Amino acid sequence: MLTKGDDYPIHQLPEPVASAGGERNFYDRYFFNGYAREGQAFFALALGVYPHRNVMDASFCVIHEGVQHNLRASRHLGVERMDTRVGPISVQVLEPLKSLRILVHENDYGIRADLTFLARAPALEEPRFQHSLGPRSLMDSTRLTQNGSYEGYFSVRGGRRVEVASEKWLGTRDRSWGIRPLGSMQESPSEPGSIPQFYWLWAPVNFDDCVTLYDINADAAGTAWHTHGVVAHLPDGQPETMQSVSSRVTYRPGTRHAQSAQILFVRPGGDELRLHIEPRYTFYMSGLGYLHPEWGHGMDRGEMALAYDTIDLATVDPAIPMYLHIQAVSRVRMGDRVGIGVLEQLVLGPHEPSGFSGLFDMAP
């Protein structure tokens, strides 16, 4: 069956683009976040395509005046993957790898947005994510990450329109595709007799003259099965991949969230760079479907579904499992540089270096 994508020279197999293949957990996904240099204003968008599940879903979230607003949409995919609209939420590629547009059209919940991402740095391909559990391949995906600025506006019900100017708003986007666990947690059981485990930190940071990227996935003993660090100098500097990277987290009591964190970069010549991360406020990734019991990624909500809820950031209980996965908007120091970025955190199950031995035990 032919679709619009077949008119582009992008084929990798002797099949039409719409062919869903046989992997139920294949996905293709956009992610964006944006944050003001000053204050506590934030937005995020995710849009995912799940061909074998016949689902496309999207979420747009805003933090405004201490409340996180979450707008979610889901529809049946059909065959046309290049129609990246889900209800009122859509993504447009204006210039590949340089500029993309987020739109949230009028809806019953009062959230609107028209935001354009403008690249500050080149899109960086991260090392391939590959992870197995026994004989099963849990993750096999490619991801690009790109830091940038934004211009446009967003608004929420009962709130004023917030103007977004590129000199005042920064953020990060990523694109990833491949295989990873989808749907509810019940669809991704752990090995018999074992406790589910996942340790993940991701820290894309914007400085005035450079950007940095860091991630780590580690097992229960703390051994990394994926980790990576890059510094890219602006505007046109060649990205420098670190020789080695490591991190250390101090947790807030009663949570699995960072009170502070340090990242160590060792450059190819042996010089060291240290990033000191000071979280300022928290975005809960459940707004984008992560760990959400009803709006998990790729879950079939029918022909078309739309939902909205809010999180009061002053009263939310971070020990509730749905709120484990976060992005902490943070002040970051690297030598004399001071920047801003996020520290994404998902610490599920045992992690010996952190002192966690159970599924949901918290820091003392």
Stretches found by the model and what they are:
Residues M1-P364:
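Structured soluble/peripheral alpha/beta segments that form catalytic or ligand/cofactor-binding pockets
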